[in-house]
């Protein structure tokens, strides 16, 4: 089965892909939110207003931390967390070169990742 992830106002594509894959593996409905926007928005505020990031979208590491927090009170988020070991050995492909943080998360989850040799943005240099 092919699972996709795309950029939204809240999440980067890698983060969305991981959440969508966990939903599929856990039999969780696509429409179900695993992380409420009310949890994501303060993280975005922290990133942009206090830590100086320009991109408010959560990377995969930040989404996994948020998911683990939600899992304490939400059974569906807890079910999704239990699917993490099942990602090992799966294949993922990105049509752009991913940020190092997302590449690192895929590596730690033991997901086999390939990327097209195209940058996601024209901002090739970071402050």
Question: Which residue stretches match the model-derived regions?
Answer:
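Conserved mixed alpha/beta catalytic, RNA-binding, or beta-rich assembly cores of soluble enzyme
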Residues: 1-55
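C-terminal binding/interaction regions
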Residues: 41-127
